[in-house]
Amino acid sequence: MTHVGKRVVKNREGIDRVKLYPVDEAVKLIKERANAKFDETVEIAMNLGVDPKHADQMVRGVVNLPNGTGRTLRVAVFARGAKADEALAAGADIVGAEDLVATVQGGTIAFDRCIATPDMMPLVGRLGKVLGPRGLMPNPKVGTVTMDVAGAVKASKGGAVEFRVEKAGIIQGSVGKASFETEKLLENIAAFVDAVAKAKPQGAKGTYIQRVALSSTMGPGVKIDPATVTA
C-alpha cells in the first residue's frame, strides 16, 4: 500500500460512513484528519431535492461568509472611467475594458472572480464561451453585474462565495480552512446552509435539503445532520 493510500485509510478510521453527525462533531473530525502539508480547504456538499433542468428549480446565489474563506481571490473588473478608478481603489487586481477582453480572448485568465458594470456587459458577453464554463461570467443575480463595483470587490475579497446547483442537484462550496477555529468554521457553515435554504426555488417539491456532508481537501467526507446547523 502506498504512503498516500495508508494515510487515506487511517483518516477514514473512526468515521461511520452511514451516521449523520452533529455539525460540531463533524468539524472536529474534519480538523483532526486534515494532516496534509498545506492548509486544507474545508468544503461542504449539499444534495438538494431539485432538478436544475427545470428553470423553476434552479438554485443560485451568493453568501458572505462571516469569517472569510481563508483564500485571497484575484478579482477582475470590467469598467471604464470613474468606475475603473473606484474598482482599483477598492483593491481590484485587474481592471480594464476592451484591453481586458483581448487579454481573456488571448487565453490569459489571471483572476478568480469577475465583476462588470452594466454598460460593459455587451462587451463582456463576447467572452461567454470562455468565462461561462469556468463559472466566471458576471451575473446580476449574484451581485457581479453592478454599479457598486467597490462594494462588489470588497465582498469578493472579504469572503463572498457564489453557489450554483449542478446537474445532479448538488451544491458545493468552500467554507474556510482547516486551520480556522472550530467556532469560525461553524459560523461559516451555518451561513452557507442558511443562504442555500433561503434560495429555495418555487418549483422545489418534497424535502429540499436532503443530505449535507463536509470534507477537507485530502480528507474523508463526513455526513452531518442538517437539523444541527443553525444560522
From Swiss-Prot:
Database matches in SUPFAM superfamilies: Ribosomal protein L1 (SSF56808)
Q: Which UniProt keywords apply?
A: Repressor, Ribonucleoprotein, Ribosomal protein, RNA-binding, rRNA-binding, Translation regulation, tRNA-binding
Gene Ontology CC: one annotated term: cytosolic large ribosomal subunit
- InterPro entries for this protein: Ribosom_uL1_bac-type, Ribosomal_uL1, Ribosomal_uL1-like, Ribosomal_uL1/biogenesis, Ribosomal_uL1_3-a/b-sand, Ribosomal_uL1_CS
Checking Pfam families in the record gives:
Ribosomal_L1 (PF00687)
Q: Name one GO biological process term.
A: regulation of translation
Sample GO molecular function, one term: rRNA binding
Q: How does it assemble?
A: Part of the 50S ribosomal subunit.
Cross-referenced PANTHER family = 54S RIBOSOMAL PROTEIN L1, MITOCHONDRIAL (PTHR36427), LARGE RIBOSOMAL SUBUNIT PROTEIN UL1M (PTHR36427:SF3)
The record describes the protein's role as: Binds directly to 23S rRNA. The L1 stalk is quite mobile in the ribosome, and is involved in E site tRNA release.
Q: What protein family is recorded?
A: Belongs to the universal ribosomal protein uL1 family.
Q: What is this protein called?
A: Large ribosomal subunit protein uL1
Q: Which gene encodes it?
A: rplA
